């Protein structure tokens, strides 16, 4: 079977949207599955729906997999994207051939870094996008030189690119770029800007350039939200897809249907970017923080809020939980009655986001294991659920039923018939009889192992008064200790599903 390229695609009779020739308007540091299923998908739609007429040049931020660039280039930038999942309760399996990518360069081989610098000098270039992992936005003094080919770190590479552009256009204020950071760290754009300033100072670059870098360019922090499995794991399913497509695709990509990109930027940026006109789920806002809070407290908080009890009740994957009226009902009550009222965004927007969460959890193509979500649940409950829990008590002057039960379920999960403390976990036994391994910070596992012979009352008191766990003594919250103990005893005696049902 022939490998995908424009000629092969044409011969298959593909009749979807394709853009073969257009100027490169976007430099993208990162060629991985996530950006290609997310950012490049949005640019592809913008080409079709908004007449953007722009290509994206991919730059590999590290040089450990140059073969990926070869594969992308063999396919002339084309690749097949499947967006699969559930939307408004309906199964979705949508295919699109993405044609917004021009090519991919590995700047560590041959003269490819020169190609990157040449693009920096282009009149057509408007935007830089990056996803270089959480470790990518980092500054270490002396790790990168100005004339290195290429500089080591991503921020050093970007500083060099910006300097090249500054020189090419004599510091023209209207030649700055929009820089969209997608790395999963807080304030990603601000952190990137800070790193670039450090490199500029290390390299003794002129003050005029530093001023241009900071004022002519727009460094944006962004929040990304789309689950990207990235590939088809079943060889038979993959073979059937390629047979149906009529070509072999070396860089085929898979993402969930849901996707939202929130960009923090100044007034007017929305009109500079092509996404609003394209009608895609990309928004420009003055502050990304409320949207980050929305994601953490609703999406992540839902996961951490119900999975531990659900696992004790005998469930193994998220989708099966959504098919159970009690567990789904518990999650929805927790979201709509206890979490959403504490968030500082439009209620309709929050309700829609929460409804989409149920669809995402019900994805028929993803077997998301509860045990994988359970990793580090102590810090997760504190970060994702505790703020909603405390805000609800502050506002309503009473305990939130579901979140209190969720806290009891967390304690139950970490103390269910403890068997042993191993080097990398705590072995517990499920009510059904099988053992499971809890993975968390060593101090948290040591704590539960040390309390394995406690009565439930002793254990609840020890957990709630653990300052290392919660940064405060939770027994000072009126009625909480008694409520958590009652919930824990209900889970132990009647099972977690019955305990969840008692909250409905």
Language model region names:
Residues 1-504:
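Substrate/ligand-engaging "lid" and interaction regions
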């Amino acid at each position: 079977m022939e490998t995908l390229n424009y000629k092969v695609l044409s011969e298959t009779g593909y009749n979807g949207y394709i853009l073969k020739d257009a100027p490169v308007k976007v430099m993208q540091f990162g060629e991985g599955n996530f950006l290609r299923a997310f950012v490049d998908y949005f640019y592809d739609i913008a080409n079709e729906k908004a007449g953007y007429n722009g290509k994206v040049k991919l730059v590999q931020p590290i040089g450990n997999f140059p073969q990926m660039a070869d594969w992308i280039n063999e396919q002339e930038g084309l690749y097949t994207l499947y967006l699969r999942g559930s939307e408004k309760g309906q199964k979705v399996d949508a295919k699109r051939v993405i044609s917004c990518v021009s090519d991919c360069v590995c700047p560590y081989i041959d003269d490819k870094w020169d190609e990157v610098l040449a693009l920096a000098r282009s009149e057509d270039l408007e935007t830089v996008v990056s996803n270089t992992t959480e470790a990518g936005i980092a500054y270490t003094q002396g790790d990168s030189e100005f004339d290195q080919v290429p500089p080591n770190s991503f921020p050093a590479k970007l500083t060099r690119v910006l300097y090249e552009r500054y020189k090419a256009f004599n510091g023209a204020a209207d030649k700055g770029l929009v820089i969209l950071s997608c790395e999963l760290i807080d304030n990603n754009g601000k952190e990137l800007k800070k790193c670039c300033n450090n490199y500029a100072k290390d390299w003794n670059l002129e003050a005029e350039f530093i001023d241009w870098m900071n004022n002519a360019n727009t460094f944006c922090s962004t929040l990304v939200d789309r689950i990207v499995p990235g590939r088809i794991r079943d060889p038979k399913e993959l073979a059937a897809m390629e047979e149906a497509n009529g070509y072999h695709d070396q860089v085929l990509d898979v993402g969930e249907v849901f996707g939202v990109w929130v960009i923090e930027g100044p007034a007017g940026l929305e009109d500079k970017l092509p996404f609003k006109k394209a009608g895609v789920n990309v928004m420009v806002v003055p502050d990304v923080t409320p949207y980050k809070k929305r994601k953490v407290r609703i999406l992540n908080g839902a996961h951490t809020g119900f999975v531990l009890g659900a696992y004790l009740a005998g469930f193994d994957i998220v989708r099966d939980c959504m098919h159970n009226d009690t567990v789904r009902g518990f999650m929805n009550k927790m979201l709509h009655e206890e979490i959403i009222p504490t968030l500082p965004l439009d209620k309709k927007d929050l309700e829609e986001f929460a409804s989409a969460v149920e669809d995402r959890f019900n994805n028929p193509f993803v077997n998301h294991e509860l045990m994988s979500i359970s990793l580090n649940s102590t810090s997760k409950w504190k970060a994702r659920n505790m703020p909603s829990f405390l805000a609800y008590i502050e506002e309503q002057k009473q305990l939130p039923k579901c979140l209190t039960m969720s806290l009891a379920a967390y304690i139950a999960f970490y103390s269910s018939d403890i068997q042993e403390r191993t080097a990398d976990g705590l072995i517990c036994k499920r009510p059904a009889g099988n053992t499971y391994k809890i993975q968390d910070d060593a101090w948290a596992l040591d704590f539960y192992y040390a309390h394995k012979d406690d009565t439930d009352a002793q254990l609840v008191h020890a957990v709630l008064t653990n300052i290392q766990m919660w940064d405060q003594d939770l027994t000072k919250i009126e009625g909480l200790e008694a409520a958590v103990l009652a919930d824990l005893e209900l889970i132990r005696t009647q099972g977690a599903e019955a305990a969840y049902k008692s909250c409905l």
